């Protein structure tokens, strides 16, 4: 679940649905959000696909040090990727134009990623994604973007 100011997007699935629902792992979400942060250091517009939905995107528009976050609907064209830099005719979704400072967005993602690494390490030292996500966190913390 993503929360920006008081607006929320996404679902937190109950544990009993884990075996029957095909869903994107938290690692994948964190990896994609890390790429959004990196791209926002270079570009003013980044759209992150909600790969679990038909046509929903999380849109990030950066102006100076502020990022405006919106949920938008736009067709996922053939050959599109999980992150795009231009959407064709996006339409406002559940909420829009929530403003957050770029530094705060970056800090929040790093903190939540750290909490996730700590949680899965404590809960299950055999978790297959622990090493990958720990490397992602360390790399993210080293980068100055």
Residue ranges and their predicted role:
Residues 31, 65-68, 103, 107:
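Generic structural signal for well-ordered, non-transmembrane alpha-helical segments
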Residues 78-145:
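Mixed-charge, glycine-accented linear interaction segment located at domain edges/termini
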Residues 2-7, 70-78:
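Secondary-structure transition/turn motif
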Residues 46-68:
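Short, structured protein-protein interaction patches enriched in aromatics and acidic/basic residues
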Residues 1-24:
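N-terminal "first-domain core" detector
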Residues 17-49:
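Short, well-structured hydrophobic secondary-structure segments
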